[in-house]
């Protein structure tokens, strides 16, 4: 088992290649809807169709992006067993714009949520493997 952190541009083929062979994938991406900037949304791949999930446009500033990658991976039987998306509502998708204060704050919160999710995933893997964490013996 290994864990990788990957930063990508949202291009569908690169996304699919990045999660190839993975059982569990956690993604943070920008989204666009009528919600206020900085709103955090949670989706599972089975709730995503096309470029949208629950009426929220995935991949905020990408022409083609995460939603299309998930659809393509599903069609090619390359979708990981578990794929979760944390979508952060963007404020401005123009080139060269930095993050607004609400979006930057949401990024910090979403990162903390992903770390918690990773910790839970690792604990679940350890318990499923039957390996218990034991303190090192002292001499």
Task: For the regions a language model picked out, list residue spans one by one.
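N-terminal catalytic or cofactor-binding beta/alpha core of small enzyme domains
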Residues: 1-88, 97-109, 113-139
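Short, internal active-site loops enriched in acidic
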Residues: 90-92
């Amino acid at each position: 088992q290994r864990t990788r952190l990957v930063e990508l541009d949202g291009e569908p083929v690169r996304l699919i290649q990045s999660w190839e062979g993975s059982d569990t994938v956690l993604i943070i991406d920008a989204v666009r809807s009528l919600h206020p900037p900085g709103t955090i949304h949670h989706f599972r791949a089975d709730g995503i169709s096309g470029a949208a999930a629950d009426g929220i446009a995935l991949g905020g500033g990408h022409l083609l992006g995460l939603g299309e990658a998930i659809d393509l991976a599903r069609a090619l039987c390359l979708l990981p067993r578990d794929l979760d998306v944390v979508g952060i509502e963007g404020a401005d998708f123009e080139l060269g714009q930095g993050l607004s204060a609400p979006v930057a704050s949401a990024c910090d919160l979403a990162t903390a949520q992903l770390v918690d999710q990773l910790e839970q995933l690792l604990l679940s893997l350890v318990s499923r493997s039957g390996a218990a964490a034991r303190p090192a013996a002292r001499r």
